[in-house]
Regions:
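Nucleotide-activated sugar donor-binding and catalytic core shared by glycosyltransferases
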Residues: 1-208
Length: 208
């Protein structure tokens, strides 16, 4: 190998520390992809109607441990609307029982605001739902690791996630820039959402 193309400065510095100086920072194609999506996002009229009534917390790719915290917050904080896109579809019935949520697939503009919780039971639309949110909770941080946070960040949303995020440079960088908060319990979740209730979207947008 005569030359290394790397995604970021940290990778270049790591190679330099072990004697490899022939590096070029080539960027991360994930950033290009999410940025392109914000330029021409797919509109979802039903979601737009739902999110107009109250500030909306988008809960993307949630797992059971995420959902246990979120369900409590939802029950105690009716001042928000909530959209939940669970990672595992078999969690949907449990979430419905706990929150009284309606399903995206069976909702229409007449009944969409009959409940402040909407569950996404359709695949492939989450990335475009973020355009309507106030803030995002990204799941996976209480398990093997957080899911994609860049899709939400690109639309200017502040991000909340669980403690297992150390392998993701973007998560650590956004925490340092006050665009993300890592939480490990309900008290921290409650505090984080309150902190982000008045968020400057330029912090997230400028990161991308």
């Amino acid at each position: 190998v005569t030359h290394f193309f790397v995604q970021d400065k940290n990778s270049a510095e790591l190679l330099k520390s072990i004697g490899f100086k022939n590096t070029t920072i080539n960027g991360d194609s994930r950033f290009d992809s999410v940025l392109a999506n914000t330029q021409n996002p797919v509109k979802i009229p039903l979601i737009e109607v739902f999110c107009k009534c109250k500030p909306t917390v988008i809960c993307g790719s949630t797992w059971k441990k995420d959902e246990l915290l979120l369900i409590r917050f939802i029950k105690e904080n009716p001042q928000y609307n909530y959209i939940i896109a669970p990672h595992e579809m078999h969690h949907i019935s449990y979430l419905q029982k706990q929150t009284g949520a309606q399903l995206f697939s069976t909702s229409n503009t007449e009944n969409i605001n009959s409940n402040n919780v909407l569950i996404i039971d359709s695949i492939g639309i989450l990335a475009n739902i973020y355009q309507y949110g106030k803030l995002a909770y990204i799941g996976g941080g209480f398990g093997v690791g957080i899911h994609n946070i860049l899709e939400a960040v690109a639309f200017g949303l502040p991000i909340i996630f669980g403690p297992n995020h150390q392998k993701f440079n973007e998560a650590k960088e956004l925490i340092n820039q006050k665009g993300a908060i890592s939480i490990s319990n309900y008290k921290e979740l409650n505090s984080a959402i309150n902190v982000f209730s008045d968020f400057d979207k330029s912090i997230a947008i400028n990161y991308i």
